[in-house]
């Protein structure tokens, strides 16, 4: 009975209560990004470390950026609002997160710059999508927070499926830069599945060689096997990026 009550609470009561919560917004550049607190999986805090990280890599302005596991799109809209890209694509499986993204697009007049997909991983992405840069703050744990979309990736299946399908959406020379958490993984956690998908790790920044007992954000840079890393990666390395 206790388990049944918990299931009712999680599937019925909490979703109804969440709909009553008020909308908030945070501003990145000229863009007001709308969200509710329960939709934030860290994009509004640690996710914004992408901005100085990519700036330190000397990233040139990108034509099109995709944010995987976007939630309300904090990272993607921040990159767009601060001039890191011309256009943006976001996707998430959570309909509430998609509603937040649509609210942001409508209220900021971004319909001609932003594409939004309600998608289980990349399953519902239009085949015509082509991205220069992919970013994402996906669930960071395979062994904790089961049932919590923002944090749990059972047996790393979400990551594995992503790596298997993302290459078709990358432009030639396109790059993936994922934000991960050393408390839940290391770069080696993903190396095998990245390799099996025909991709290659081109840099790792900020990762210890073991899982840590505390939160430690790190980044993995990934490309198709055989492709030459862009010049800005090498320029950024002289500024301190760790390969």
Give the ranges of each region predicted by the language model.
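N-terminal auxiliary segments of SAM/dcSAM-dependent transferases
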Residues: 1-24
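S-adenosyl-L-methionine
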Residues: 24-55
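Class I (Rossmann-like) S-adenosyl-L-methionine-dependent methyltransferase catalytic domain
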Residues: 35, 83, 97, 144, ...
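Conserved SAM/SAH cofactor-binding pocket of Class I
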Residues: 46-127, 133-136, 142-143
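Mobile active-site "lid"/loop adjacent to the S-adenosyl-L-methionine
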Residues: 135-161
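Conserved Class I SAM-dependent methyltransferase catalytic core
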Residues: 158-209, 213-216
């Amino acid at each position: 009975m206790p388990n049944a009550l918990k299931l009712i609470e999680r599937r019925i009561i909490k979703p109804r209560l969440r709909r009553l919560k008020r909308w908030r917004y945070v501003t990145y550049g000229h863009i007001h990004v709308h969200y509710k607190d329960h939709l934030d999986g860290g994009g509004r805090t640690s996710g914004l470390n992408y901005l100085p990280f990519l700036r330190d890599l000397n990233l040139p302005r990108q034509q099109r950026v995709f944010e995987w596991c976007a939630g309300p799109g904090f990272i993607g809209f921040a990159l767009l609002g601060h001039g890191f890209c011309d256009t943006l694509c976001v996707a998430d499986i959570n309909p509430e997160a998609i509603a937040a993204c649509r609210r942001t697009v409508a209220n900021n007049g971004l319909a001609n710059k932003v594409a939004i997909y309600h998608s289980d991983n990349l399953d519902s992405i239009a085949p015509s999508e082509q991205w220069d840069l992919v970013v994402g703050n996906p669930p960071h744990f395979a062994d904790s927070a089961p049932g919590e979309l923002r944090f749990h990736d059972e047996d790393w299946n979400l990551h594995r499926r992503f790596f298997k399908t993302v290459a078709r959406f990358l432009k030639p020379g396109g790059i993936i830069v994922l934000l991960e958490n050393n408390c839940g993984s290391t770069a080696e956690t993903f190396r095998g599945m990245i390799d099996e998908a025909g991709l290659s790790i081109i840099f790792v920044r900020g990762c210890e060689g073991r899982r840590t007992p505390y939160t430690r954000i790190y980044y993995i840079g990934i490309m198709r096997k055989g492709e030459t890393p862009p010049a800005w990666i090498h320029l950024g390395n002289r500024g301190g990026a760790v390969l």
